[in-house]
Amino acid sequence: MVKIGVIGLQGDVSEHIEATKRALERLGIEGSVIWVKRPEQLNQIDGVIIPGGESTTISRLMQRTGLFDPLKKMIEDGLPAMGTCAGLIMLAKEVIGATPEQKFLEVLDVKVNRNAYGRQVDSFEAPVKLAFDDKPFIGVFIRAPRIVELLSDKVKPLAWLEDRVVGVEQGNVIGLEFHPELTDDTRIHEYFLKKIV
């Protein structure tokens, strides 16, 4: 039985839990999804999702709760991880616009610009092209970060908005600018689950 953890410190945690449950069901995989708040819960999981929210807050709370160091090591050791929006920022190697107290997991060789699309009012939805499926995916961008550079050839584009990369994959790690959990389309969560089973 597969167990997926969603880092539940701040952000759209319940939406990711529901989307992952639906994806498990659609794939016919027996599994469960847990809300991770403490480091000892990390030992129970086969994959982790870092949701959107506010990256400064998520970074601070991950350090305060003791999740940061063990999670970083587990991802470096091969734990499948997916980060959306602020979760992408947390996974990134380099972050433009970071505050001095922010710490990042640095497990994804990308440079991201923290609030590249501007304020909440500039949020938008647009069709995104996926590397693994011909049908477009509706990308929900909410004060999204922007992937400005791929820092190694280990990083593979996974999603495009027109000709710009908005989602990437590097081994066991997926990072997305947008929020797949805010749609009824579970294809990205299913793709992530297939990395685990």
Swiss-Prot record:
One of the protein's GO biological processes: pyridoxal phosphate biosynthetic process
Catalysed reaction, written as an equation: aldehydo-D-ribose 5-phosphate + D-glyceraldehyde 3-phosphate + L-glutamine = pyridoxal 5'-phosphate + L-glutamate + phosphate + 3 H2O + H(+); L-glutamine + H2O = L-glutamate + NH4(+)
The keyword Lipid metabolism appears for this protein: no
Pfam family, one: SNO
Residues that hold L-glutamine according to the record: 53-55, 114, 142-143
GO cellular component: cytosol; glutaminase complex
Domain of life: Archaea
Active-site feature positions: 85, 179, 181
Subunit organization: In the presence of PdxS, forms a dodecamer of heterodimers. Only shows activity in the heterodimer.
Cited PANTHER family: PYRIDOXAL 5'-PHOSPHATE SYNTHASE SUBUNIT SNO (PTHR31559), PYRIDOXAL 5'-PHOSPHATE SYNTHASE SUBUNIT SNO1-RELATED (PTHR31559:SF0)
Family affiliation: Belongs to the glutaminase PdxT/SNO family.
Protein name: Pyridoxal 5'-phosphate synthase subunit PdxT
Species of the source: Pyrococcus furiosus (strain ATCC 43587 / DSM 3638 / JCM 8422 / Vc1)
Organism classification: Archaea, Methanobacteriati, Methanobacteriota, Thermococci, Thermococcales
Gene: pdxT
